[in-house]
């Protein structure tokens, strides 16, 4: 399970060190893909394969489904962390997420998100006040 907030630095070669506590879950490889809110999602390979299988069952006659599948496939990069736990983010991913040297990696239960630190701060400022209301609506009767 991926939980917590971490603040690694992006180096000049586009490498980001993943938090040590997540590395064992990512040993089999990982998939970096474009996500909502101009962030990047990092899935363990097996988790991403399940997501891709579910997504591929969408109707190809639906233009929105086709667009989603195209963007999912084209915007995904397979990575294997090096011995220091670093992954290299593509120039396209760095541009999409507007990543600077200061990044934030957050656990999102079954995957990670990579944000530019300022973008994450701005997102938190905008959405923190609505956390209680959003959790009531999103979780409903679950908790």
Curated annotation (Swiss-Prot):
GO terms for biological process: negative regulation of DNA-templated transcription initiation. Residues 5-47, 76-119 form the SpoVT-AbrB domain. GO terms for cellular component: cytoplasm; nucleoid. Pfam families: MraZ (PF02381). It comes from the Bacteria. InterPro entries: MraZ, MraZ_C, MraZ_dom, MraZ_N, MraZ_sf, SpoVT-AbrB_dom, SpoVT-AbrB_sf. Keywords: Cytoplasm, DNA-binding, Repeat, Transcription, Transcription regulation. One of its GO terms (molecular function) is DNA-binding transcription factor activity. It is found in: Cytoplasm, Nucleoid. Belongs to the MraZ family. Forms oligomers. This is Transcriptional regulator MraZ. The lineage of its organism: Bacteria, Bacillati, Actinomycetota, Actinomycetes, Mycobacteriales.
């Amino acid at each position: 399970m991926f939980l917590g907030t971490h603040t690694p630095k992006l180096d000049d070669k586009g490498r980001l060190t993943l938090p040590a506590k997540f590395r064992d879950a990512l040993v089999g490889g990982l998939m970096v893909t474009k996500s909502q809110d101009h962030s990047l999602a990092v899935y363990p390979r097996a988790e991403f394969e399940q997501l891709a299988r579910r997504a591929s069952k969408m109707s190809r006659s639906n233009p929105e489904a086709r667009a989603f599948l195209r963007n999912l496939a084209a915007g995904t990069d397979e990575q294997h962390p090096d011995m220091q736990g670093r992954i290299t983010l593509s120039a396209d991913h760095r541009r999409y997420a507007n990543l600077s040297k200061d990044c934030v990696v957050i656990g999102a239960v079954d995957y990670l998100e990579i944000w530019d630190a300022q973008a994450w701060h701005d997102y938190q400022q905008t959405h923190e006040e609505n956390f209680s209301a959003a959790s009531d609506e999103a979780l409903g009767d679950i908790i």
